[in-house]
Amino acid sequence: MLYGDRSIENTDGTIRSLSNRHVQMIAIGGTIGTGLFLGAGTTISATGPSVIFIYAIMGLFFFFLLRALGEMFYFDSNSHTFVSFITRYLGEAAGRFAGWTYWIGILFACMAELTAVSTYVQYWLPGLPAWLIEVSVLGLLTLLNLTAAKLFGETEFWFAMIKIIAIISLVVTGI
């Protein structure tokens, strides 16, 4: 359990250093993806406000999908990932396939994020090569992920806060 900002030691000797506010802001910040800033403008200009309807439909779909997954985790708390459910109900081969395709998908998503960051930075610093920006950001993110969990959570908390403030500012100035 997470209690405020205190670290809790688990029965296996590990320590949970992320507080409830860290976990909540990591979840909120994770839902506000780069595509919202980079790709939404082009999509909205091409399709108009109907894209909001599509976002709502997809959001509703994923809401129910994650509710169902949450029910499965509640029913069987020994399973730690969706891959364990796939392995149990569809077999070892399907579970292995799902695990590897998920890993490859995350790898591609990370590379897309690095490309988006270099696009943003090159807007302000056009002379900087994209590969240098991407390697620098990758190194910074690696260092951030190698730090203590509490520092990682605090950094992610403030990055998510910046995203939320940026979205609210864009909506307010757009009105």
UniProtKB/Swiss-Prot annotation:
Disulfide bonds listed in the record: none
TM spans (from-to): 25-45, 46-66, 97-117, 124-144, 155-175
Keyword Lipoprotein: no
Membrane topology: Multi-pass membrane protein
Domain of life: Bacteria
InterPro entries in UniProt: AA-permease/SLC12A_dom (IPR004841), Amino_acid_permease_CS (IPR004840)
Subcellular location: Cell membrane
Gene Ontology cellular-component annotations: plasma membrane
GO biological process, one term: transmembrane transport
Main location, first listed in the record: membrane
Keywords: Amino-acid transport, Cell membrane, Membrane, Transmembrane, Transmembrane helix, Transport
Listed PROSITE patterns: AMINO_ACID_PERMEASE_1
Family: Belongs to the amino acid-polyamine-organocation (APC) superfamily.
Name assigned to this protein: Uncharacterized transporter in pepV 3'region
